[in-house]
Amino acid sequence: MAGDAVAAYCDASVRRDIDGLLDTLAPDAELVSPLSGRMVFRGRADLKVLLGAVYGALRDWQWEQQFGEGDMRFVVGRGRVGGLPLDDAMVFELGPDGLIHKVRPHLRPWLGTSVFALLLGAKIARHPGVIWRALRG
């Protein structure tokens, strides 16, 4: 996975290096919420808040092999949240600049995802502007 934005994203997320992770994102990058299809988080400032909360809640996180080529990539991740297993099938869309322009997480199983939603919701609720902008679509 070495040498591209997705590999760098995965490496930074495992280390909880949010600034390093943000370096892999385009300035106008967006993340489509897997918990609420209506919410789309945009821009590095809002993504810093969101991704800090996301990777701060996960334990023993690891990514497996990267699939895809060109501007579409797919990586499977797994770890724990609140002591429960959580898996992610993350789809990344890259721009012509090689940076990540869109992130689409797909989480399972249900119980781990539910606990994750509760933990993440409590952390993100401290930032109502981030929530408001994500809901505006």
Language-model regions: role of each:
Residues 1-137:
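C-terminal and inter-domain tail/linker signature
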